[in-house]
């Protein structure tokens, strides 16, 4: 008989924690890219491709290579092996990044290690929910996992500027990066240890009758690509996740484009706050009403005004404060809808592609979003962000087409 065990909440908690620190490490410098360039001055060419923004882009580059191998490990050997591999690498590389924070090269190498670990965690969201949660709770479990990712990004966006010298008008501008990265490093290491100790593969009996996959990894991919709804989901993630990855990675540059001198991280922070609220509400409603499609449509339509406001804020006023306020409000709206679509899309994809392995369908969605995110960030950051405004306009157009 299917049974839901209380230990499922322990599993979800440790999975959420490892997601939090993974996202902190991803964007630790994204909101403070300009003062970080001062801290690492002389260690890289600011006008080259290998700059501060490249640290966030590493995650996307490596994900394209490691996503399918990670999904294969999770599908073949289980979530305990897959997530444990990721957690061990996250703990070691996160701590090394903090200990060797003064060396830009060392930070880049540690970031590569963190990027290798990323798909072993991100691709396991639906696998964790299916192995441990009954069908009626899976949208909520996926939503809470996404919520943890957003909390991690929010910490990176909001807390980091307070831990370093981020105001160019202050004498300590560009300092404090060593202690900040070391603090994040020890936090990451501690969470990784807890994850390794508490993680379990599956409960003694399945939580639902459909909890066991029937397809192998290769069969699952072929089955997934035959599903029309899955092909639509791949397109939506191709656009939506790509935009989210690009905006998250370039948040400080977007703030500069809006005329904001202080690297306060609020544009990215409010997008994350909106995403946290959305991920707390819409997946729960989706579970309650047993509907996925209608809420996905709401998310796609709702992101349009947010993207337009963020792109064309400067067209509404010449006052910097007003432009910044419009950018902040638009960022919140964009985050609420675009970030709620993630957990809904993952769970919907797992359901329409059953009995294909869940981590395979999720890995494919993440893969296409990382691909476009990489392309977008590369285009936005080239020649000292020369094409940033044009890229934002393209995002606005793509959001309308998707809706």
Functional labels for PLM-detected ranges:
Residues 292-345:
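C-terminal transmembrane helical hairpin of 12-TM major facilitator-type secondary transporters
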Residues 139-165, 363-376:
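Glycine-rich segments within core transmembrane alpha-helices of 12-TM secondary carriers
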Residues 29-30, 227-279:
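Extracytoplasmic gate region of multi-pass secondary transporters
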Residues 350-385:
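A late C-terminal transmembrane helix in Major Facilitator Superfamily
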């Amino acid at each position: 008989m299917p049974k839901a065990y209380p230990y499922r909440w322990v599993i979800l908690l440790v999975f959420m924690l490892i997601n939090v620190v993974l996202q902190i490490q991803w964007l630790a410098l994204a909101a403070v890219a300009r003062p970080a360039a001062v801290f690492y001055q002389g260690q890289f060419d600011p006008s080259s491709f290998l700059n501060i923004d490249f640290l966030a882009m590493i995650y996307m580059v490596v994900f394209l290579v490691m996503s399918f191998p990670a999904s294969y490990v999770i599908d073949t050997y289980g979530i305990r092996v897959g997530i444990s591999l990721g957690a061990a690498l996250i703990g070691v590389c996160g701590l090394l990044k903090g200990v060797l924070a003064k060396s830009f090269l060392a930070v880049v190498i540690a970031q590569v290690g963190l990027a290798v670990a990323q798909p072993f965690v991100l691709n396991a969201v639906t696998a964790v929910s299916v192995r441990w949660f009954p069908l009626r709770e899976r949208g909520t479990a996926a939503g809470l996992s996404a919520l943890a990712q957003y909390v991690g990004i929010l910490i990176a966006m909001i807390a980091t500027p307070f831990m370093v010298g981020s105001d160019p008008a202050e004498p300590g501008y560009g300092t404090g990066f060593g202690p900040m990265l070391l603090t994040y490093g020890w936090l990451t290491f501690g969470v990784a240890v807890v994850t390794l100790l508490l993680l379990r593969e599956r409960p003694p009996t399945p939580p639902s009758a459909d909890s066991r996959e029937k397809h192998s990894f290769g069969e699952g991919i072929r089955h997934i690509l035959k599903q029309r709804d899955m092909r639509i989901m791949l397109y939506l993630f191709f656009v939506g996740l790509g935009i989210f990855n690009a905006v998250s990675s370039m948040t400080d540059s977007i703030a500069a484009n809006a005329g904001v001198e202080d690297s306060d991280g609020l544009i990215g922070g409010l997008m994350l706050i909106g995403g946290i609220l959305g991920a707390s509400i819409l997946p729960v409603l989706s579970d309650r009403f047993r509907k996925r499609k209608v809420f996905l449509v709401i998310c796609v339509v709702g992101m349009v005004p947010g993207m337009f406001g963020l792109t064309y804020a400067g067209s509404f006023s010449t006052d910097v404060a007003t432009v910044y306020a419009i950018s902040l409000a638009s960022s919140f709206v964009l985050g609420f809808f675009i970030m709620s679509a993630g957990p809904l899309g993952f769970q919907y994809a797992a359901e329409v592609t059953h009995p294909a392995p869940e981590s395979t369908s999720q890995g494919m969605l993440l893969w296409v979003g990382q691909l476009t995110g990489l392309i977008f960030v590369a285009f936005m950051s080239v020649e000292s962000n020369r094409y940033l405004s044009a890229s934002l306009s393209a995002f606005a157009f793509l959001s309308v087409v998707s809706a």
